[in-house]
Structures are given as structure tokens and as C-alpha cells.
Regions:
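Nucleotide-sugar donor-binding catalytic core of glycosyltransferases
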Residues: 17-87, 91-95, 99-100, 123, ...
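Short hydrophobic "strand-cap" motifs at the C-terminus of beta-strands
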Residues: 171, 234-236, 341
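Conserved acidic donor-binding segment of nucleotide-sugar-dependent glycosyltransferases
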Residues: 341-347, 356-361
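Internal alpha/beta domain cores that form substrate/cofactor-binding pockets in large enzymes
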Residues: 68, 72-140, 145-178, 184-186, ...
Length: 398
């Protein structure tokens, strides 16, 4: 699986590293479903801005993780930045400002009418993006590089980073990739316990870190008291989500569900969800959905198994929605079933409980309010960051 587990006391060089001009943390974020790329393309105002201003404005929109971990780390006294390695327009903007040679830009201006040149361009773009990321790590010389799942890297790249960083961390929240260099990282964090067991069986140091909620969102997005008396499902559907698709299709025949997300084309032709599809929701629009609906339903995907590992649970609970989710291992350590969250074991129970909640909005609101209070108390990114620092043996800087 890779090199042996790093037994160095992680974080020992934190203070001496800072005196050398580097930063403490550099986060390498996933461009989940091209959300950052699409947000950049959709806003011409960003195109003329210098990289730093552009990135700050883009990350402040709460797309995917937004700047939640950056804010939490800086609140703990660390210097922290993040980049999105596969957000091509943003990375190319950084390269322009840093005077990094980028052959993709001038090759893109050449006419390409056949398939082969397109493939060549794609390979070149991948090489250029890898090179830009390496330059960013060299220029920042972070003590910790934290890579998030969904960003493909080779073992040789991670080894190259090590020349300019103290430690490499990985967050993983999707199915395992063949040939991914998991063993090159000092610590892998995951919200799915079964993944942690797989890593530990390979001799890789791994630790449990659940998803979280950015508490700043409720200062910008209203949590409505009078809510839409329907169910919202926000998420993705794909050919690999057969159980989720069949479950939601059947449930939508019993209770009113509005679907936000991607993959509507994979639903059965006669599915009510096709008629109640509301498009995709990112950033503050996503949180507005959670803050507006009475009930939010969740169904795990295969890799999550029976674990309470979905980001959606914390986002919807943080916005005060009454979350209905399948009974999961470890859920009771996060939320109190029946009081802060509603659980089901099968389709029939799910439908029956949702019908009860829709007929008794006061009960649903009471559960949502308790869930929000629990989330703000125990499940913010600040709390997750403190847990991470404990794993690393790092204290906040004075």
C-alpha cells in the first residue's frame, strides 16, 4: 500500500517552521462536481480580479466546504490557505499572477478539429495543473498539506511535496480508488468507519473525523420558522446509486418530495421526482433549501454502508430542518434519535414517519430546533478542527 506509517511526532516542527517563512496549513480542496469551476464561469465579475481576491470571494460562498476549515484553523491561531487543484480557471489565474509558464493557455488558442488533439490537450492540462500545484506548495512551504478526496495524485507527486512540507494528511469520503497512494500520507481522516478499518489493516494511520456545519451560515441564510410543508432531498443520483434511486422513487409516490441535485436522468421515466425536480443547489442556495423545508430526507450511498457519515446530516440539522435518515451505526453518538433526528429501518417506516411529521409541523419543528442546537454545540468545523489537532498532538499557537 505504500511506505510504512510515519512514526514521527506530527506537529513537532510547527513553531520553527513558521519562523522560516512558510505557512502552517495548505488545504487542497476537491472541485466537487465541478462546483467551483462552474461558479467561477457563471460570474464574469470574478474573471478580472487578481487571484487572491477572486479565491476569497469564491470560497466565501460556502460551496462544498467553502472556507469553513480555513476559518476554523485561523481561529485556532494558525496561518492557513487553500487551493482547488482541479479548478482550472482559478489555478490558471494563480499561475498568471505567479509568472508560471502555462503551455495550456497558448495551445488552447490553436484550432483542434480532431479527437487526438483534444486528448493531447486534456493530458497537457492535467500535467500543467499538477505543475501549478507543486509550485504552490513550494511557494508556501506549509507545515501541513491536507489533501481532500476527489483530487487524483501520484505517489511521486506526494513524495515531491515532502521536500517542502512537514506532513501530509488526507481526507477520504468516497469509494477507494485503485492505485491511489494512500500509504504516502502521515494520517488519513474519514467519516466512514469501514474505510478507517481498511486503512488500518494496511498499516496506515487513520482516524475518525465526522462531517460538520459552518455556524457562520445562519448569520447569512435565514432559518424559517414557517416552513414549506414538503420533503426535500438534496444530493446526487448516478448509475451506482441504484438503492438510493429505487428508494427515493418509491418514497416519492407516497409523500411529496422536491429533488435538488444532479442525476435526474437516472430516475424511472414515470417517477414523480422528475416532475418535482428543482435543479441544483450550491453554496447559500443549498443552505436556503435546508432552512426552508420542514423535512429533509437522507439515504446513504453504498460506500457509506450503515454509517452516519453524510455531510447532508449536519448541514440540514444546522439549518434547523427535521432530518429523516436511515438507522445508522454510531448515529446516536451524534444526534439523539427521536429527539434530534428521526430514523427509519425500511421504506414503509420512512413513509409513515414522514407522513406523521407533515401532519404535525410543530413536532417536526421541535425536532429540527433541537438538532440545530446540538449541531451548534458539538458539530461545527471549529470542533472538528480541535479534534484534528488533538490527533496530531498540536496545540493552538499562542
Amino acid at each position: 500500500m505504500g511506505r510504512p506509517v510515519n512514526t514521527r511526532p506530527v506537529g513537532r516542527a510547527m513553531k520553527t517552521r513558521r519562523s522560516g517563512g512558510g505557512i502552517d496549513w495548505l488545504l487542497l480542496m476537491e472541485d466537487y462536481q465541478a462546483s467551483y469551476t462552474e461558479a467561477y464561469k457563471a460570474d464574469p465579475k470574478l474573471h478580472s480580479l487578481p487571484y487572491k481576491v477572486c479565491a476569497e470571494r469564491l470560497f466565501s460562498r460556502a460551496i462544498y466546504y467553502g472556507d469553513a476549515y480555513i476559518h476554523a484553523l485561523t481561529s485556532c491561531g494558525f496561518s492557513a490557505e487553500q487551493v482547488v487543484p482541479l479548478c482550472q480557471p482559478l489555478q490558471f489565474k494563480w499561475a498568471d499572477g505567479a509568472d508560471v509558464w502555462n503551455p495550456s493557455e497558448w495551445i488552447a488558442k490553436l484550432p483542434m478539429n480532431s479527437g487526438s488533439p483534444v486528448i493531447i490537450r486534456q493530458l497537457l492540462d492535467r500535467w500543467v495543473l499538477s505543475r501549478i500545484l507543486a509550485k504552490q506548495i513550494v511557494s508556501r512551504r506549509p507545515e501541513f498539506v491536507w489533501l481532500f478526496s476527489g483530487v487524483p495524485v501520484a505517489a511521486r507527486e506526494v513524495r515531491r511535496w515532502r521536500r517542502y512540507t512537514g506532513h501530509t494528511l488526507l481526507w477520504w469520503s468516497c469509494p477507494l480508488w485503485e492505485d491511489f497512494p494512500y500509504g504516502e500520507f502521515d494520517l488519513i481522516l474519514a467519516a466512514i468507519p469501514s474505510l478507517i478499518r481498511v486503512f488500518e489493516e494496511q498499516g496506515i494511520r487513520a482516524a475518525y473525523l465526522p462531517h460538520a456545519f459552518d455556524h457562520r451560515i445562519i448569520q447569512r441564510v435565514p432559518c424559517l420558522e414557517s416552513r414549506i410543508p414538503r420533503v426535500a432531498f438534496v444530493g446526487s443520483l448516478s448509475p451506482g446509486h441504484t438503492d438510493r434511486i429505487s428508494f427515493l422513487h418509491a418514497l416519492s409516490r407516497r409523500v411529496p418530495i422536491d429533488f435538488y441535485g444532479s442525476g435526474v436522468q437516472f430516475l424511472p421515466k414515470d417517477s414523480p421526482l422528475r416532475h418535482s425536480y428543482r435543479g441544483q443547489a450550491w453554496g447559500e442556495d443549498l443552505y436556503s433549501v435546508y432552512g426552508s423545508y420542514l423535512v429533509v430526507v437522507h439515504r446513504n450511498i453504498d460506500v457509506a454502508g450503515t454509517s452516519a457519515s453524510a455531510k447532508r446530516l449536519f448541514e440540514a440539522a444546522g439549518m434547523g430542518a427535521c432530518v429523516v435518515t436511515e438507522s445508522s451505526d454510531g448515529l446516536s453518538s451524534l444526534f439523539a434519535p427521536g429527539e434530534e433526528i428521526v430514523t427509519y429501518s425500511d421504506l414503509e417506516e420512512c413513509g409513515a414517519k414522514i407522513e406523521t411529521l407533515l401532519s404535525d409541523p410543530a413536532k417536526a419543528r421541535a425536532i429540527g430546533q433541537k438538532a440545530q442546537a446540538r449541531t451548534l454545540q458539538d458539530h461545527t468545523y471549529y470542533q472538528r478542527t480541535r479534534t484534528l489537532l488533538d490527533y496530531l498532538g498540536v496545540n493552538q499557537l499562542q
